[in-house]
From Swiss-Prot:
Its EC number is 2.7.7.6. It comes from Vesicomyosocius okutanii subsp. Calyptogena okutanii (strain HA). This is DNA-directed RNA polymerase subunit beta. One of its GO terms (cellular component) is DNA-directed RNA polymerase complex. Keywords: DNA-directed RNA polymerase, Nucleotidyltransferase, Transcription, Transferase. The RNAP catalytic core consists of 2 alpha, 1 beta, 1 beta' and 1 omega subunit. When a sigma factor is associated with the core the holoenzyme is formed, which can initiate transcription. GO terms for biological process: DNA-templated transcription. Belongs to the RNA polymerase beta chain family. Coiled coil: none annotated.
Length: 1360
């Protein structure tokens, strides 16, 4: 296999037994692809999706009078004014201007009013401004008002039809009541439900229920039509004493014979006997077409159609009448010989519709529609037109009802209609089919749906959500436009005059700013960002609420396999409602989640991969990824464990149709990063995957010794690393940028020959962690497309590195690791292993107040010189200044209201000109508990406000940086163009004298070296073709220069213009303070297996346990944390980590020996390490220099990869330990650092990747003096943010009671808590220097009294 530039530097030893046929898809594709399909920026011809689809559905808008119309033509998105970084800095939204091309068509008023025959009088075309559309950044986020936000995808119930039952919970009898619901994408919901009397009802939008026949009547069906639609008929010939039933024998099955059934004078079934399949067979063989039955059989049957007297035309018996003796008598009297009755077999089909029809009070179509109108619009007067309009708009009009493409597909599939497309509104046939299917389910001929399967839940991604917001905004615009169009001609209006963009802008802005699904991006480390973008939430508008969501909807469902991760979900109230996409999952065009499988044909695994949704998966038999397959792809076992119809079954290998693509297919990105996941309990794996997202990036990232092989994928797809856009050679590198000269073969015609990558240096993330990029390449390195050029936060050589590899021992140590506490060595702190940088942004605003403008200045009243020492003359802190709690960062004074001065004060003021008393100090100071170094200052000034010296110097610096980039870019491009010109001129004969070179002289390299590029451009040779080619290249160089000059002017104008600031703000100063935080007692740490704890002590190195070679342990963990938690993966990680480190030490020893055959030795040893088991590595592809570089990078340990559910075998860990000359047990003899004595037993020692979590004691430590109190109870508030107190609870009271500390206890429960009067007295006594405390009545007692009174019990306090 080919290795990339960074992979060659350090190979991870992969122990996976099966290599995936499919590479992991782009982890951010769900966000990026959805948004791109919404805006269709690259499409010349736009498809009917996204923004284009919305505009097409709303336009054309026609005037009420029909003489004017606005038509949609096309739309355009302009280039944003500022790039992403500038938007973050300025606090503005990264958005593009949306312009829509519209035609205002005016029709001739004298012509026809018919749509097709209208005569066009005038067309006015105009590009109309329709607001700002926030754009997605390359990383799948949005910058809204300067902060990065992520729009989380939503999992909601799919449009279509669903059949369910209440599990017998609705009615006291426990009877199961079946129901069905047609859910549109947009429009009224339609519910059909049975009551406990087995009558069928309909509800529209969950309103009052109506008999289902009312809806059928409203659709235009008569009683006869209804009965004919839902029932089979039995024709009956009436005789004097009997009747002949024209009935199929099958219709009699499972019924009890009400009379003797006679065939050829032989009784086949006796009266009172149940008719079985055997009887039906006999009747069928005899060819019976009709059965003779006594007239009594017709009693209690239902007549199918109206029976009319042929002579008079009157209805004798109406349809749906139950036959009685009177009815039979009436038939006999009127000599009716033929009737039709409904075929109702109590064991097979019920008479639900017939019974419901009898309840229905409506008789005609208009009555039925009136009935529906009264339910939908109670209290409103019902006219025939209004009634018809409402009914038709409910389900049958596109503008009010939309099933969507998904809804139609789901509806058709469930109703057994072969085609997947159709109208997006309901038809009469749809409604009838749904009712028929519901009756079938009730009769036991079909089953209800599983509402929690992913076949009935779909993902609504970002593109679809913005599309819906746009539709909401445009519908608001439509009303106003329709009214305005009437005046279009008389007032000579243009499309821009008619269309107000504010409703559209407001809808989009509201969605991004305040929607539950538009969230502040989790940016602690690269993994947290990737996971946030891949999150799928069932909450949000149109979704579930956490209070109402039951257990079933939160539970893991078999259809989640390979689509949603069964492990990664939050703990707490949102458990199961917020999920994460599995690694390979993607959404299809309908929004359903799909997962890839390899096709299996006749027991042989093919190379063909298909993506399957939960809808299609139900028919397949799917084998697991670990099924044994031989070299030819044949399944080796006869019986294979498979999934089929949501069950695990053992099937013959020939029955298998699909096989999993990879063992990690089931899990999410975070869960796939946990080595030995298969050995961890699910609850701890959940904590492990959640805690990895909280790991703070440390100063020097270190790759995990034990990984899973997906680390490189996460680092690349998170976009925190810098990857090469083209192949080429590294021209220049420094800490802040990388310049690549691109291979001329790799560039397209219009692309530049140089790539400049500006690195992000010490930038602040949303969670105040540090984003910093460090170059990995050196000048002269040859790189190819996709190579990692620079590491970002928490990445090491292009691999995700969230923590540090620490030497761990599992043993108790003087109680310091009681209850998951962690003991760490002082060496860890000294080596800055877990030192992190946190950057805080502090902002000062200079506002224009009623009393005059605030001023940013270093001249602040009543402030000492030392306090101002870190400010420049403008009043802004210097970059590089060390600041601590209370220091001024930006000096600012605010005008005070004028006080009335005495004549003496006025005189003094006039003499000394003292104005200090007119202003008060309102400077920006750093918080009392904070300290750090100022790393950056940005000053923004409003337009037409003069910039101060500091702002001008910052602007000049920025311009200088841009100019340097442009100059470097141009010099490389210019150099490349003239290198090509020299190559073309080489060997040609000069046709025009230049300087001291005569005509006819042949050009050589030496000759051309004497001339600069300016002169070379003037060379003319005898070959006309070469002259033309040279002229084209010279023209190209000039064009590039002009292009760069234009770009520089544009950037300069951007910097010089004023900033967009909030109303009333004249100037804004942003100060960035970086704080270095070392590991200390109280910080939270964790492994990747849910093994978390708090540091209890930082022990001196000399006191830590040590090994026989004198090396000390870094971290001591409690062995009791393993068995009950059942996360044994951490122990296996420690063993494998120990082997990895030991192998690194052996490689280091070979390198340090420097023997003549060192390279050969290293090759032999690396071959033993890498080709022990699992994926084979071909080291012959490496040159000797590359092998030595690889070996040097492996000094600190050979990184291992043990993929989830396909990990390293136990014997392989033992083989590696043996190869590293370490004990196979993974246990060593440890010695006590304090006494030097050996411990009683051997201890498990090894290396574990430990993380420092973003729960730092510095941020949590807090002490209250006095502060705010709760309004009702008058007790102190809780929490650091509210400057609250510590809760002194019931158990703490017991503790003080046990020690008899009566005075302390009284203080705690009264004056320190909610005794208002006592508090005031306490202050007074402290001021007076007295030590007396007197407690009065606590406020909580008054609250209790009030609560008792609210129950109607009068409580009064008697004074004694």
């Amino acid at each position: 296999m080919a290795y990339s530039f960074t992979e060659k530097k350090r190979i991870r030893n992969n122990f996976g037994s099966r290599e995936s046929i499919l590479t992991e898809p782009d982890l951010l594709a769900i966000q990026i692809d959805s948004f791109n399909s919404f805006i269709q920026a690259d499409n010349k011809i736009k498809q009917d999706i996204g923004l284009h689809n919305v505009l097409q559905s709303v336009f054309p808008i026609t005037a009420v009078n029909g003489y004017a119309q606005i038509e949609y033509v096309d739309y355009q998105l302009k280039e944003p004014k500022f790039n992403v970084e500038e938007c973050k800095l300025r606090g503005v939204t990264f958005a593009s201007t949306l312009r829509v091309k519209l035609n205002l068509v005016l029709f001739d008023k004298n012509g026809s009013t018919l749509k097709k025959k209208r005569k066009v009088k005038q067309i006015i075309e105009e590009d109309v401004y329709l607001g700002q559309l926030p754009l997605m950044t390359e990383t799948g986020t949005f910058v809204i008002n300067g902060t990065e936000r992520v729009v989380v995808s939503q999992l909601h119930r799919s449009p279509g039809v669903i059949f369910e039952h209440d599990k017998g919970k609705t009615h006291s009898s426990g009877k199961i009541l079946f129901s069905s619901r047609i859910i549109p994408y947009r429009g009224s919901w339609l519910d059909f439900e049975y009551d406990h009397h087995e009558h069928l009802y309909v509800r529209i939008d969950r309103r009052r229920k109506l008999p289902v026949t009312t809806l059928l009547r409203a659709m235009g069906l008569s009683s006869e039509d209804i009965l004919e639609t839902f029932f089979e008929k039995t024709p009956v010939k009436l005789k004097a004493k009997s009747c002949d039933l024209s009935m199929l024998p099958i219709h009699l099955q499972r019924t009890i014979a009400e009379f003797d059934i006679v065939v050829n004078q032989h009784v086949v079934v006796e009266k009172g006997r149940r008719i079985t399949a055997k009887h039906v067979k006999l009747l069928g063989k005899a060819g019976i077409k009709s059965i003779n039955a006594p007239l009594e059989y017709l009693l209690d049957k239902v007549i199918c159609a109206d029976i009319i007297n042929k002579d008079t035309g009157e209805i004798l018996i109406s349809a749906n009448t139950i036959t009685s003796e009177e009815v039979l008598e009436l038939l006999n009297t009127n000599k009716v010989k033929k009737i039709e009755i409904l075929y109702i077999n109590s064991s097979e089909t019920g008479a639900y519709i017939s019974d419901t029809l009898r309840l229905d009070e409506t008789q005609t179509e208009i009555e039925a529609r009136m009935s529906i109108y009264h339910v939908m619009r109670p209290g409103e007067p019902a006219t025939e037109d209004a009634v018809n309009l409402l009914f038709n708009n409910l389900f049958f009009k596109n503008d009010r009802y939309d099933l969507s493409k998904v809804g139609r597909m789901k509806l058709n599939r469930r109703l057994g209609i072969s085609r997947e497309t159709g109208e997006h509104v309901l038809t009469n046939d749809d409604i009838i089919r749904v009712i028929k299917l519901l009756i079938n389910i009730k009769d036991g001929n079909d089953s209800v749906d599983d509402i929690d399967t992913l076949a009935n839940r779909r993902v609504r991604a970002i593109g679809e959500m913005i599309e819906n917001q746009f539709r909401i905004g445009l519908v608001r615009v439509e009303k106003a436009v329709r009214e305005g169009l009437n005046l279009a001609e008389t007032d000579e209006l243009t499309p821009q005059d008619l269309i107000n963009s504010k409703p559209v802008s407001a809808a989009v802005r509201e969605f991004f700013g305040s929607s539950q699904l538009s969230q502040f991006m989790d940016q602690v480390n690269p993994l947290s960002g990737v996971t946030h973008k891949r999150r799928i939430s069932a909450l949000g508008p149109g979704g579930l609420t956490r209070e109402r969501a039951g257990f079933e909807v939160r539970d893991v469902h078999p259809s989640h396999y390979g689509r949603l991760c069964p492990i990664e979900t939050p703990e707490g109230p949102n458990i199961g409602l917020i999920n994460t996409l599995a690694v390979y999952a993607k959404t299809n065009s309908y929004g359903f989640l799909e997962t890839p499988y390899q096709i299996v044909k006749n027991g042989k695994v093919t190379k063909e991969v298909i993506y399957v949704s939960a809808i299609d998966e139900i028919t397949h038999t799917i084998a697991q990824a670990n099924a044994l397959v031989d070299d030819r792809g044949k399944l080796m076992d006869d019986l294979i464990s498979c999934r089929h119809k949501n069950e695990f079954v053992l099937v013959d290998s020939s029955e298998v149709t699909l096989i999993d693509i990879d063992s990690k297919q089931i899990s999410s990105v975070a869960a796939s990063l946990i080595p030995f996941l298969e050995h961890d309990d699910a609850n701890r794996a959940l904590m492990g995957s959640n805690m990895q997202r909280q790991a703070v990036p440390v100063l020097k990232a270190e790759k995990p010794l034990v990984g899973t092989g997906i680390e490189r994928v996460v680092a690349k797809d998170s976009r925190v690393c810098v990857t090469a856009k083209h192949g080429g050679v590294v021209e220049a590198v420094d800490a802040s940028r990388i310049v690549i000269r691109v291979d001329s073969k790799k560039t397209k015609a219009n692309e530049l020959g140089v790539d400049i990558y500006n690195l992000t240096k010490y930038s602040r993330s949303n969670q105040n962690t540090c984003i910093n990029q460090k170059p990995l390449v050196r000048t002269g390195d040859k790189i190819t497309f996709g190579d990692v050029l620079a590491d970002g936060p928490s990445t090491d050589m292009g691999e995700l590195a969230l923590g540090q590899n620490m030497k761990i021992a599992f043993m108790p140590w003087n109680g310091y690791n009681f209850e998951d506490s962690i003991l760490i060595s002082e060496k860890v702190v000294q080596e800055d292993r877990y030192t992190t940088i946190h950057i805080e942004e502090l902002t000062a605003y200079s506002r224009d107040t009623k009393l005059g403008p605030e001023e940013i200045t270093s001249d602040i009243p009543n402030v000492s010189e030392s306090a101002l020492s870190k400010l420049d003359e403008v009043g802004v802190v210097y970059v590089g200044a060390r600041v601590k709690g209370g220091d001024i960062l930006v000096g600012k004074v605010t005008p005070k209201s004028e006080t009335v001065l005495s004549p003496e004060e006025k005189l003094l003021r006039a003499i000394f000109g003292e104005k200090a008393n007119n202003v008060k100090d309102s400077s920006l100071r750093i918080g009392a508990s904070k300290s750090g170094v100022v790393i950056d200052v940005q000053v923004f000034t409003r337009d037409r406000v003069e910039k101060d010296i500091r702002a001008l110097s910052i602007d000049a610096e920025r311009l200088e940086r841009i100019k340097k980039d442009i100059d470097d870019e141009f010099s490389i491009i210019d150099g490349d163009i003239f290198r090509r010109i020299r190559l073309k001129l080489l060997g040609n004969v000069l046709s025009k004298a230049i300087g001291d070179i005569r005509i006819g002289e042949r050009l050589s390299i030496k000759l051309m070296k004497k001339f600069d590029n300016k002169d070379i451009a003037k060379f003319k040779v005898e070959n006309a073709t070469v002259n033309k080619e040279v002229a084209v290249l010279v023209k190209q160089a000039k064009a590039k220069k002009v292009e760069f000059e234009k770009f520089f002017k544009k950037e300069k104008a951007k910097i010089n213009e004023g900033a967009e600031l909030p109303p009333g703000v004249m100037k804004m100063v942003k100060v960035y303070v970086a704080t270095r935080k070392t590991l200390q007692v109280g910080d939270k740490m964790a492994g990747r297996h849910g093994n978390k704890g708090v540091i209890s002590r930082v022990s001196p190195v000399e006191d830590m346990p040590y090994l026989a070679d004198g090396s000390t342990i870094d971290i001591v963990l409690n062995p009791l944390g393993v068995p009950s938690r059942m996360n044994v993966g951490q122990v296996l990680e420690v063993h494998l980590g120990y082997a990895a480190k030991g192998l690194g030490y052996k490689i280091a020893a070979i390198l340090d020996e420097r023997r003549p055959d060192m390279v050969k030795q290293i090759r032999v040893f690396l071959d033993k390490v890498y080709n022990l088991h699992g994926k084979k590595e071909d080291l012959t592809l490496f040159s000797n220099e590359e092998i030595i570089e690889l070996a040097n990078n492996l000094r600190e340990g050979v990184p291992m990869a043990t993929p989830v559910f396909d990990g390293i075998r136990e014997q392989d860990i033992k083989s590696l330990l043996r190869l590293a000359d370490l004990p196979e047990s993974g246990q060593e003899q440890l010695y006590d650092g304090r006494t030097g004595e050996p411990f009683d037993r051997h201890v498990t020692v090894g290396y574990m990747h430990m993380l420092k979590l973003n729960h730092l004691v510095d941020d949590k430590m807090h002490a209250r003096s006095t502060g705010p109190y709760s309004l009702v109870t008058q007790q102190p508030l809780s929490g650091k943010a509210q400057f609250g107190g510590q809760r002194f609870g019931e158990m703490e009271v017991w503790a003080l009671e046990a020690y008899g500390a009566a005075h302390t206890l009284r203080e705690m429960l009264t004056v320190k808590s909610d005794d208002v009067a006592g508090r005031a007295k306490m202050y007074k006594s402290i001021v007076d220097g007295k030590n007396l405390t007197e407690s009065v009545m606590p406020e909580s007692f008054n609250v209790l009294v009030k609560e008792i009174r609210s129950l109607g019990i009068d409580v009064e306090l008697e004074q004694h």
